[in-house]
Amino acid sequence: MRELLPFLLLLFTLTVFSQKEANFWYFGRNAALDFNTGTPTPANGSKLNTLEGCSSFSNENGELIFYIGAPSAIARNLTIWNSNDEPMPNGIGLKGDSSSSQSALTVPAPGQPNIYYVFTVGARSSNNAGFWYYTIDMTKEDGLGDVVAGPVALGDPSNHSEWTEKVTAVRAKECNAFWVISSYADKFYAYKVNTAGVSLDKVSTINGYNTIDPRGYLKVSPDGKKLVAANMESGTHIFNFN
């Protein structure tokens, strides 16, 4: 991530996972949509109640396995609910914040079909900014899942109070790995997720770039060559990613 390019805002479609793993969308105040028939239909039972960041994940057959967010506008720490709309064991009061822009990101563990990593980012406004990850094992609780590890602090914990609300992922050049990316000030932190787990970070410093406001979004182009950072108050920038 070396070159800073001035550019207009572009929206990229992030094709990280197979199509059916995004067949359920859980968002907002108890809202959910099922895309399995090709036409979005309401899904009932959501316990989610959030104005901003949230996440949901389905299996390769398009069946919901869990979703992530907050149960109310007051309780901003994250909860992970299973497909029965019940909190997972160890899945209540997690690090992160439902008021952060990108809040939670799920990445399937390569080579371990029942393991998922959930990456979370907090928010400065509630004094819980930072970057962490948790591990979910879907073989637990009769297939409904359990949060078996975490929180693991990522980035530089000494700078967590100034961490941004941005996190994204893209498939690596080798098909059985992913890159997970977040940022702080003038630095981008990239973590390779492969069969060995979550690797140590690779840090890139961008001269002349700084995030004044933590809010915004990170996205990677589908070919994995460009990273776009849309920042509140400090514009939108595109970088080479390799």
Language-model regions: role of each:
Residues F24-G28, S58, I65-G69, Q112-R124, ...:
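Hydrophobic core segments of beta-strands in well-ordered, beta-rich domains
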Residues Q19-S101, V107-G111, T120-V147, K173-N242:
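Beta-propeller domains
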Residues A123-S183, N194, T205-Y209:
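Asp-box/WD-like beta-propeller blade repeats and closely related beta-sheet repeat scaffolds
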Residues Q19, N49-E63, K95-N114, P157-A177, ...:
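Structural signature of eukaryotic scaffold interfaces centered on beta-propeller domains
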Residues P6, L10, N61, M138, ...:
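Residue-level marker of positions within ordered structural domains that often coincide
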Residues M1-F24:
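Bacterial Sec-dependent N-terminal signal peptides
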